């Protein structure tokens, strides 16, 4: 995949975040008046180009990069540490929010099989390791660690996020993807972090579409075959998925399955839905990649 030269990336970021605008925003805070060595431009670009992309993500490494970029003689660790207060965090959030709002979306119409959808939305999450002092706010799954989790839904037509949120590293992806009218007419692509039968049902009930990976141990009841095979193929109707999966050799599985889930969270009342299960054979491993969807064969 093509990657632009570093100089091109730097130029794009500098045009998106002009130095004069950064300084003007910083003057609205009390950091500039209180801290003589505070240089918002050097600090912002250090964060953009050096600290987050480097292998050493300690605050000390960040300080060293900042001193180099700001060309200041020296700066104590304690003074640098004190800059990271709620006011500075709010400033960074304001800069990011305005940048996203002012981006030229360059929306492209979906073509071919995708033109039937209002949009194709990809939901995912990623972990960012933080300085350990932040563990009280951004807890991690491991001990003595701090993690931030970014939850993002991206539009295929624009290449931009439609919604995003940050939480601590322990927060599960599924809890950060609401359902509602926003899914109507859109195809939602989901990874295993969003594997939830109740979620699939809500997307379908709100006139949306979904494609989700399936867990390895999923054992649905097959109620109908949507594609027939010639020869002595194994009949699947009425079988449980795990009972027949290892014996199949066909290139593709295309069946209707049933699944059960709680109709309302914690209510104990169950519901049963029928969805489509598609499997594609990986000839190198001999195993199937399985997907669950409410899309029809057309």
Regions found by a protein language model. Name each.
Residues 70:
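Adenosine ribonucleotide-centric catalytic and binding domains
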Residues 1-59, 65, 73-74, 84-87, ...:
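Single, function-defining residue in the core of a domain
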